[in-house]
């Protein structure tokens, strides 16, 4: 049972961390679902990027959960649950283009509104380390949005497997490299279909 005294008087940051934790946890599961759809539609690389982003969100959620438990200790809150209002749950599940659009919208909201607002509140409450952590997570979400935008552009323009000029395509299964505007229908090295090719991009 939640103690009403603490619900009314707990720091706003504790509520915000809980909202963010819920959001990151849900995003992780959505991206996992989106990865399966991308794979079914022949977008192997996009599927992997969804899974990579899901893992990023898992890491965010882990840190948020840690910060929540630390604040509970600080304020001597023994309750086993925190009640928060105003949590919206995205339920978009469409094709890859639709899923990318929904992902872009979510990531944009997080890095332009949610995390900056939550960080400012935390700083006002004297929780600078938490504020810094929230701003850092926001930077990661900005990167997610930028990456999803690039992928959406390619899906909508039909250029995932077709470029204007010859580029190097690398097979994601065996590493074979092909030079051309499009990848081969089948990898001559391992026989995997063209959906396993991606543009070679290596900067070390």
UniProtKB/Swiss-Prot annotation:
Pfam family, one: Rubrerythrin
Binding of Fe(3+) 2, residues: 57, 107, 141, 144
Keywords noted in UniProt: Cytoplasm, Electron transport, Iron, Metal-binding, Transport
Binding site for Fe(3+) 1: 24, 57, 110, 141
Keyword flag Metal-binding: yes
Span of domain Rubredoxin-like: 166-204
Subunit comment: Homodimer. Possesses two rubredoxin-like centers and two non-sulfur oxo-bridged di-iron centers per dimer.
Protein's name according to its UniProt entry: Putative rubrerythrin
